[in-house]
Amino acid sequence: MVFFPWWISLLFNKGLESWVTNWWNTTHSETFLTDMQEKSILDKFIELEELLLLDEMINEYPETHLQTLRIGIHKEMVRLIKMRNEDHIHTILHLSTNIICFIIFRGYSILGNKELLILNSWMQEFLYNLSDTIKAFSILLLTDFCIGFHSPHGWELMIAYVYKDFGFAQNDQIISGLVSTFPVILDTIFKYWIFRYLNRVSPSLVVIYDSMND
Protein backbone atom coordinates (compact mmCIF):
# COMPACT_ATOMS: atom_id res chain seq x y z
CA MET A 1 0.00 0.00 0.00
CA VAL A 2 2.83 2.38 0.87
CA PHE A 3 5.00 1.63 -2.18
CA PHE A 4 2.10 1.03 -4.60
CA PRO A 5 1.92 4.64 -5.95
CA TRP A 6 5.70 4.75 -6.41
CA TRP A 7 5.74 1.45 -8.32
CA ILE A 8 2.89 2.56 -10.57
CA SER A 9 4.57 5.92 -11.20
CA LEU A 10 7.86 4.25 -12.12
CA LEU A 11 6.21 1.75 -14.48
CA PHE A 12 4.12 4.38 -16.27
CA ASN A 13 7.08 6.75 -16.48
CA LYS A 14 9.19 4.15 -18.27
CA GLY A 15 6.30 2.91 -20.40
CA LEU A 16 5.13 6.33 -21.60
CA GLU A 17 8.56 7.91 -22.12
CA SER A 18 9.18 6.63 -25.66
CA TRP A 19 5.56 7.24 -26.71
CA VAL A 20 5.49 10.84 -25.42
CA THR A 21 8.89 11.60 -26.95
CA ASN A 22 7.82 10.23 -30.34
CA TRP A 23 4.48 12.08 -30.19
CA TRP A 24 6.09 15.40 -29.30
CA ASN A 25 8.82 15.18 -31.94
CA THR A 26 6.30 14.06 -34.60
CA THR A 27 3.56 16.62 -33.97
CA HIS A 28 5.87 19.59 -33.30
CA SER A 29 7.98 20.26 -36.35
CA GLU A 30 9.17 23.54 -34.80
CA THR A 31 10.74 23.72 -31.36
CA PHE A 32 8.39 25.32 -28.85
CA LEU A 33 10.04 27.80 -26.49
CA THR A 34 8.50 30.14 -23.96
CA ASP A 35 9.47 33.81 -23.87
CA MET A 36 11.65 33.16 -20.81
CA GLN A 37 13.42 30.26 -22.51
CA GLU A 38 13.96 32.28 -25.70
CA LYS A 39 15.44 35.12 -23.65
CA SER A 40 17.71 32.71 -21.77
CA ILE A 41 19.04 31.13 -24.97
CA LEU A 42 19.42 34.54 -26.65
CA ASP A 43 21.37 35.89 -23.66
CA LYS A 44 23.63 32.85 -23.79
CA PHE A 45 24.17 33.36 -27.53
CA ILE A 46 25.03 37.04 -27.05
CA GLU A 47 27.42 36.14 -24.23
CA LEU A 48 29.25 33.60 -26.40
CA GLU A 49 29.39 36.04 -29.33
CA GLU A 50 30.86 38.74 -27.09
CA LEU A 51 33.47 36.32 -25.76
CA LEU A 52 34.36 35.34 -29.33
CA LEU A 53 34.63 39.00 -30.36
CA LEU A 54 36.81 39.82 -27.35
CA ASP A 55 39.03 36.82 -28.02
CA GLU A 56 39.31 37.86 -31.66
CA MET A 57 40.34 41.40 -30.67
CA ILE A 58 42.98 40.23 -28.19
CA ASN A 59 44.47 37.41 -30.23
CA GLU A 60 45.07 37.24 -33.95
CA TYR A 61 43.63 33.90 -34.92
CA PRO A 62 43.51 32.56 -38.47
CA GLU A 63 40.14 32.49 -40.18
CA THR A 64 39.90 28.70 -39.89
CA HIS A 65 40.16 28.91 -36.10
CA LEU A 66 37.47 31.60 -35.92
CA GLN A 67 35.24 29.47 -38.13
CA THR A 68 35.75 26.54 -35.74
CA LEU A 69 34.74 28.74 -32.80
CA ARG A 70 31.58 29.88 -34.60
CA ILE A 71 30.68 26.25 -35.32
CA GLY A 72 31.19 25.51 -31.63
CA ILE A 73 28.81 28.35 -30.71
CA HIS A 74 26.24 27.00 -33.16
CA LYS A 75 26.52 23.51 -31.66
CA GLU A 76 26.11 24.94 -28.16
CA MET A 77 22.94 26.76 -29.22
CA VAL A 78 21.55 23.58 -30.77
CA ARG A 79 22.35 21.71 -27.56
CA LEU A 80 20.51 24.31 -25.44
CA ILE A 81 17.45 24.20 -27.71
CA LYS A 82 17.38 20.39 -27.59
CA MET A 83 17.66 20.54 -23.81
CA ARG A 84 14.67 22.91 -23.62
CA ASN A 85 12.74 20.60 -25.94
CA GLU A 86 13.48 17.67 -23.62
CA ASP A 87 12.23 19.76 -20.68
CA HIS A 88 8.84 20.09 -22.43
CA ILE A 89 8.75 16.34 -23.04
CA HIS A 90 9.52 15.61 -19.39
CA THR A 91 6.84 18.07 -18.27
CA ILE A 92 4.17 16.30 -20.34
CA LEU A 93 5.48 12.88 -19.29
CA HIS A 94 5.49 13.59 -15.55
CA LEU A 95 2.14 15.37 -15.62
CA SER A 96 0.49 12.52 -17.54
CA THR A 97 2.06 9.92 -15.25
CA ASN A 98 0.90 11.69 -12.09
CA ILE A 99 -2.67 12.07 -13.40
CA ILE A 100 -2.87 8.38 -14.36
CA CYS A 101 -1.35 7.30 -11.05
CA PHE A 102 -3.80 9.47 -9.12
CA ILE A 103 -6.76 7.90 -10.97
CA ILE A 104 -5.42 4.37 -10.33
CA PHE A 105 -4.66 5.09 -6.68
CA ARG A 106 -8.10 6.64 -6.22
CA GLY A 107 -9.74 3.57 -7.75
CA TYR A 108 -7.62 1.30 -5.58
CA SER A 109 -8.62 3.22 -2.44
CA ILE A 110 -12.31 2.86 -3.36
CA LEU A 111 -12.11 -0.84 -4.26
CA GLY A 112 -9.87 -1.61 -1.29
CA ASN A 113 -12.06 0.23 1.17
CA LYS A 114 -12.20 -2.76 3.52
CA GLU A 115 -8.41 -2.90 3.88
CA LEU A 116 -8.29 0.86 4.50
CA LEU A 117 -10.93 0.57 7.22
CA ILE A 118 -8.88 -2.14 8.95
CA LEU A 119 -5.75 0.01 8.73
CA ASN A 120 -7.64 3.04 10.03
CA SER A 121 -9.08 1.13 12.99
CA TRP A 122 -5.64 -0.24 13.83
CA MET A 123 -4.12 3.24 13.77
CA GLN A 124 -6.90 4.66 15.95
CA GLU A 125 -6.43 1.88 18.50
CA PHE A 126 -2.68 2.43 18.53
CA LEU A 127 -3.05 6.18 19.09
CA TYR A 128 -5.75 5.67 21.72
CA ASN A 129 -3.42 3.46 23.79
CA LEU A 130 -0.73 6.14 23.92
CA SER A 131 -0.56 8.37 26.97
CA ASP A 132 -1.41 12.07 26.69
CA THR A 133 2.23 12.96 27.41
CA ILE A 134 3.48 10.84 24.48
CA LYS A 135 0.78 12.29 22.23
CA ALA A 136 1.68 15.86 23.20
CA PHE A 137 5.39 15.15 22.69
CA SER A 138 4.71 13.61 19.26
CA ILE A 139 2.56 16.56 18.19
CA LEU A 140 5.19 19.04 19.40
CA LEU A 141 7.99 17.15 17.64
CA LEU A 142 6.01 16.94 14.40
CA THR A 143 5.05 20.61 14.39
CA ASP A 144 8.59 21.78 15.19
CA PHE A 145 9.97 19.48 12.51
CA CYS A 146 7.48 20.64 9.84
CA ILE A 147 6.78 24.28 10.67
CA GLY A 148 9.51 25.24 13.12
CA PHE A 149 12.14 27.93 12.62
CA HIS A 150 14.63 25.36 11.27
CA SER A 151 12.29 23.80 8.69
CA PRO A 152 12.47 26.19 5.65
CA HIS A 153 15.39 24.31 4.05
CA GLY A 154 13.49 21.03 4.34
CA TRP A 155 10.39 22.61 2.78
CA GLU A 156 12.55 24.03 0.01
CA LEU A 157 13.94 20.58 -0.81
CA MET A 158 10.52 18.92 -0.65
CA ILE A 159 8.75 21.56 -2.77
CA ALA A 160 11.60 21.50 -5.30
CA TYR A 161 11.28 17.69 -5.50
CA VAL A 162 7.51 17.88 -6.06
CA TYR A 163 8.03 20.67 -8.59
CA LYS A 164 10.56 18.53 -10.44
CA ASP A 165 8.38 15.41 -10.17
CA PHE A 166 5.63 17.21 -12.10
CA GLY A 167 8.17 18.04 -14.79
CA PHE A 168 8.29 21.80 -14.29
CA ALA A 169 11.53 23.71 -14.70
CA GLN A 170 12.92 24.89 -11.40
CA ASN A 171 11.90 28.45 -10.56
CA ASP A 172 13.59 29.79 -7.43
CA GLN A 173 11.10 32.66 -7.04
CA ILE A 174 8.05 30.36 -7.02
CA ILE A 175 9.75 27.88 -4.67
CA SER A 176 10.79 30.71 -2.33
CA GLY A 177 7.23 32.05 -2.32
CA LEU A 178 5.78 28.63 -1.49
CA VAL A 179 8.36 28.07 1.26
CA SER A 180 7.48 31.40 2.88
CA THR A 181 3.68 30.95 2.72
CA PHE A 182 2.81 27.24 2.87
CA PRO A 183 4.23 26.52 6.37
CA VAL A 184 2.38 29.58 7.71
CA ILE A 185 -0.92 28.31 6.29
CA LEU A 186 -0.21 24.84 7.66
CA ASP A 187 0.60 26.28 11.10
CA THR A 188 -2.68 28.22 11.14
CA ILE A 189 -4.70 25.13 10.18
CA PHE A 190 -2.95 23.05 12.82
CA LYS A 191 -3.58 25.58 15.59
CA TYR A 192 -7.23 25.78 14.57
CA TRP A 193 -7.43 21.97 14.71
CA ILE A 194 -5.96 21.97 18.22
CA PHE A 195 -8.41 24.63 19.33
CA ARG A 196 -11.52 22.99 17.85
CA TYR A 197 -10.92 19.23 17.88
CA LEU A 198 -8.41 18.39 20.61
CA ASN A 199 -9.92 20.87 23.04
CA ARG A 200 -13.21 18.98 22.73
CA VAL A 201 -11.87 15.41 22.59
CA SER A 202 -8.98 15.57 25.07
CA PRO A 203 -8.63 18.79 27.12
CA SER A 204 -5.84 17.24 29.19
CA LEU A 205 -3.80 16.69 26.02
CA VAL A 206 -4.16 20.36 25.11
CA VAL A 207 -3.02 21.40 28.61
CA ILE A 208 0.07 19.16 28.39
CA TYR A 209 0.81 20.39 24.87
CA ASP A 210 0.58 24.05 25.93
CA SER A 211 2.83 23.39 28.94
CA MET A 212 5.47 21.67 26.82
CA ASN A 213 5.20 24.33 24.13
CA ASP A 214 5.80 27.11 26.65
Swiss-Prot record:
Please report the record's description of how this protein sits within the membrane.
Multi-pass membrane protein
Please indicate which superkingdom the organism of origin belongs to: Eukaryota
Where are its TM segments located? Answer: 92-112, 174-194
Q: Its Gene Ontology biological processes?
A: potassium ion transport
Keyword Metal-binding in the entry? The reply is no
Reaction(s) catalysed by this chain, per the record, are:
K(+)(in) + H(+)(out) = K(+)(out) + H(+)(in)
Database matches in InterPro entries: CemA (IPR004282)
Entry function: Contributes to K(+)/H(+) antiport activity by supporting proton efflux to control proton extrusion and homeostasis in chloroplasts in a light-dependent manner to modulate photosynthesis. Prevents excessive induction of non-photochemical quenching (NPQ) under continuous-light conditions. Indirectly promotes efficient inorganic carbon uptake into chloroplasts.
The name of this protein is: Potassium/proton antiporter CemA
Organism whose genome encodes this protein: Oenothera argillicola (Appalachian evening primrose)
From the broadest rank down, the organism's phylogenetic lineage runs: Eukaryota, Viridiplantae, Streptophyta, Embryophyta, Tracheophyta
Q: Give the gene that encodes this protein.
A: cemA
